[in-house]
């Protein structure tokens, strides 16, 4: 873009204009670019592995954000350079998020990657209370105390093309600032200069040595209490209160390693469609979620329910036998079909009449430690609605709550001992162009005050076996704790 085009866009009324440059980056990786450009508070790295086995084409590296929104309950704080510049008590924090995003009138420049910045971060599980007032405030203690919503204004991002070995660096420029075009171009050149510098070496992760033992964890439940909670849910199901509930346990350990080393280990042990590393300054969120919560791209709304789990086998033959066993398990199939129906209902709430389709039904996807049954539901976003409307309709996922959803969440409030926080919420972005991509916050660690917390659960139906449900939660956290052990082992050397 030249200066004349920049000024033309400013005259039209855009208050943010993307400036971009493209460069070969075949000697770099998304991780090395993050460490060179963005390894500071309020930054992020987003990567993807499709179907558990193939790296996605694009990775996104968010440079440190100067403006951040933090929401606790109904109180909203906007911080700029770490200083609170706005403070609001609001009736609907989700409406505030949308109105805040609308302050940014960003020009859509042809040829740029489909994601070139936006509001990036998470919406916690308890954001459902902004929509479903019947649930009230969380009745459970909140030992983590992290925000219910945390979003960074991502106005400088690098999009790495893993296939072509090149990258786009994109910065948003406010045309009202003095010498805005020249300052934006200078910032891009500064980023390129930084990329040319060698990276400070980090200690390698030793994958050939003896495998570190998984750390012992402290649970929010005893095993007996968790199995009793499963039994109580089965009583509710038999009484006709609900068809399924998804309880969870939080597992916590002391953690002294560098959070980025945990991400490095996790992307090795458990590559998934949604991999993320967030440095929020006072805490980190590190995850490898297999499951989209809701995606809106060019007005197509997509959810992808995952339900039905088996551990991975030691051989291909064992994997196939486990797949056959999973697909012939009446309990797992019934649970999955229930969640397909819930997904259709959720997508239908914001889609044009007759547009909702089941585009994939009960396929198996394999991950490092487990395999899942997966389906795909899509619909055309109804005219007049936005990506935020889709989030309102679908958060939290049925796979993290149950069916019917509201009654299941009331039972979760009754039986779980702590507020869920990030777990079970949405991690991802609202792009400037109106698109949205969010993952369910599962297989996710919150690192806070020298402790690491990971939460896992499972869907309970009428014929669930309490002992097996406990074991399922242990299997689901195994990749994370294996990564924790390697990160700790590396830091101790």
Curated annotation (Swiss-Prot):
UniProt-recorded Gene Ontology molecular function terms: anthranilate synthase activity; metal ion binding
Protein origin, superkingdom: Bacteria
Enzyme kind, highest EC tier: lyase
Name by which UniProt lists this protein: Anthranilate synthase component 1
Amino-acid biosynthesis listed as a keyword: yes
Intrachain disulfide bonds: none
Regulation: Feedback inhibited by tryptophan.
Encoding gene per record: trpE
Reactions listed under catalytic activity: chorismate + L-glutamine = anthranilate + pyruvate + L-glutamate + H(+)
Binding site for chorismate: 308-309, 423, 443, 457-459
Species assigned in the record: Pseudomonas putida
């Amino acid at each position: 873009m030249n200066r004349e085009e920049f000024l033309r866009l400013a005259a039209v009324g855009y208050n943010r204009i993307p400036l971009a440059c493209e460069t070969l980056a075949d000697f770099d990786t998304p991780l090395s670019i993050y460490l060179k450009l963005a390894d500071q508070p309020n930054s992020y790295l987003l990567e993807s592995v499709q179907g558990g086995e193939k790296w996605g084409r694009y990775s996104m590296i968010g440079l440190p954000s100067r403006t951040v929104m933090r929401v606790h309950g109904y109180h909203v704080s906007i911080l700029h350079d770490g200083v609170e510049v706005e403070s609001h008590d609001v009736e609907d924090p989700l409406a505030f998020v949308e109105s805040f995003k609308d302050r940014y009138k960003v020009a859509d420049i042809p040829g740029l990657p489909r994601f070139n910045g936006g509001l990036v971060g998470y919406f916690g599980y308890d954001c459902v209370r902004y929509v479903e007032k019947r649930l009230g405030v969380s009745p459970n203690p909140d030992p983590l105390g992290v925000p219910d919503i945390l979003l960074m204004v991502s106005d400088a991002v690098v999009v790495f093309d893993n296939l072509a070995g090149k990258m786009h660096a994109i910065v948003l420029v406010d045309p009202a600032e003095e010498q805005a075009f020249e300052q934006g171009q200078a910032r891009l050149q500064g980023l390129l200069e930084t990329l040319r510098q060698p990276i400070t070496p980090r200690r390698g992760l030793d994958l050939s040595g003896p495998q570190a033992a998984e750390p012992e964890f402290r649970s929010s439940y005893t095993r007996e209490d968790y199995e009793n909670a499963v039994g109580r849910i089965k009583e509710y199901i038999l009484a006709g209160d609900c068809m399924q509930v998804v309880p969870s346990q939080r597992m916590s350990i002391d953690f002294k390693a560098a959070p980025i080393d945990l991400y490095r280990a996790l992307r090795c042990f458990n590559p998934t469609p949604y991999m993320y590393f967030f440095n929020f300054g006072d805490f980190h969120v590190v995850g490898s979620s297999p499951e989209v919560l809701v995606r809106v791209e060019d007005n197509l709304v997509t959810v992808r329910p995952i339900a039905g789990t088996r551990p991975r086998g030691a051989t291909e033959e064992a994997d196939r036998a486990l797949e056959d066993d999973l697909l012939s398990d009446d309990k797992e199939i019934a649970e999955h079909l229930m969640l397909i129906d819930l997904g259709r209902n959720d997508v239908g709430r914001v889609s044009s009449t007759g547009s909702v389709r089941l585009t994939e039904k009960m396929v198996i996807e394999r991950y490092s430690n487990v395999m899942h049954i997966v389906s795909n539901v899509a619909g055309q976003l109804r005219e007049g609605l936005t990506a935020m409307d889709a989030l309102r309709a679908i958060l939290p996922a049925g796979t993290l709550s149950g069916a019917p959803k509201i009654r299941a969440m009331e039972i979760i409030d009754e039986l779980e001992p702590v507020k869920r926080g990030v777990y079970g919420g949405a991690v991802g972005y609202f792009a400037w162009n109106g698109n949205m991509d969010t993952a369910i916050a599962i297989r996710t660690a919150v690192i806070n005050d020298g402790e690491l917390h990971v939460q896992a659960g499972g869907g309970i139906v009428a014929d669930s076996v309490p002992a097996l449900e406990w074991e399922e939660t242990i299997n689901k956290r195994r990749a994370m704790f294996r990564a924790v052990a390697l990160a700790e082992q590396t830091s101790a050397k």
